[in-house]
């Protein structure tokens, strides 16, 4: 059963579809599916492994649970608003839903075998609801969400990587180890504190507990003529603490300077004049 769209803002809700129109839309999808079965020569539902239903002007799709062995489904470049037709397609491995008008992806958690999911160019708004629906997909490796309203949130990419650690290719870009380390620091403060404590032999302030910058509102871009020192992307934050924290996370190296004791003669060396008594030197260590 599809989620009640009343939880969405009025301007973002999908338009109500009259019963007759919905029935007609389902009939159109049924006809398109039957045509595909004839083209491929399938006589039994058990023989269907793939369905190509893109660019059919579909607004609704009939229930596809009859195709138990369906593995590949193309539904891109249609006019779909939701996904309520994939409830028992447990073998589905690749699903192409890009270039539609999808507001809600409720129902995708029924697809445990899915490893490729394309959802770019849709109308997804709620990032938390989207992530919640995708969390159970342990086999998901490739995901696209770009050109959706939810992509406008700050740290959107790191948020997805944190909650979907199995994803290797996000929005056509490989997930890097640097991104994985960054998302741990930003969203898993306890684990980050343990990692730093091990790295610095327990010499880390136990009170360190930064706030999650993801709770802030979407960043606002200031006019191009607004300039201030050392500001690169000109992203404005509602809370100064968030700005300070995000800025600190962008530092790629840390330098530690101390006295090089190898250049300082001992008392005995001074007495025996075995070592040049020149000025002591400083030693700089850079950590990355």
Swiss-Prot record:
Database matches in Gene3D superfamilies: Ribonuclease Inhibitor
SUPFAM superfamilies: L domain-like
Residue ranges occupied by any LRRCT domain in the UniProt entry: 148-186
Keyword Ribosomal protein: no
InterPro entries to which the protein is assigned, alphabetical: Leu-rich_rpt, LRC72, LRR_dom_sf
LRR repeats: 47-68, 69-90, 91-112, 113-134
Source taxon at top rank: Eukaryota
A Pfam family assignment: LRR_9
Keywords from the UniProt entry: Leucine-rich repeat, Repeat
PANTHER family: LEUCINE-RICH REPEAT-CONTAINING PROTEIN 72
Name the UniProt record assigns to this protein: Leucine-rich repeat-containing protein 72
Species the sequence originates in: Bos taurus (Bovine)
Lineage of source species: Eukaryota, Metazoa, Chordata, Craniata, Vertebrata
